[in-house]
């Protein structure tokens, strides 16, 4: 029996289908409790494209798909349950490098990346913060 998708998984599906509202997606991500795998007390992340991605999952089923390939094998994968807002507002800035949030990366056709840009992460760690400020300075 397949469990129903979370509200965030629904927003991701809408966005991937081209019918979602990006602001609603970001809002849902911020309100959602996400499961972040941990190893030795450190949150799981991966580097790709010059960005460190904190990997998080919308539910235990999505986390289990990931654990099949990346888990410790003979024992359950530890994880932390964190609000999306806490991940992008506190965890990401604490990494000290460009970082974003990758959700449900083991779900075929169901993943979503929240890059380190203004409107997702705090301006102080957003990679586009200077460009946004320049745009505002010209009366846009």
Predicted feature residues:
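An interfacial alpha-helical scaffold signature
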Residues: 1-140
């Amino acid at each position: 029996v397949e469990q129903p998708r979370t509200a965030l998984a629904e927003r991701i599906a809408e966005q991937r289908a081209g019918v979602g509202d990006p602001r609603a997606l970001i809002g849902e991500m911020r309100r959602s409790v996400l499961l972040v795998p941990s190893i030795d007390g450190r949150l799981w992340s991966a580097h790709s494209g010059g960005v460190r991605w904190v990997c998080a999952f919308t539910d235990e089923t999505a986390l289990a798909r990931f654990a099949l390939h990346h888990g410790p094998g003979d024992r359950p994968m530890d994880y932390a349950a964190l609000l999306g807002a806490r991940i992008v507002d506190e965890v990401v800035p604490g990494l000290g490098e460009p970082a974003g949030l990758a959700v449900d990366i083991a779900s075929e056709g169901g993943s979503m990346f929240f890059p380190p840009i203004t409107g997702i992460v705090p301006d102080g760690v957003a990679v586009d913060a200077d460009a946004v400020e320049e745009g505002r300075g010209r009366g846009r």
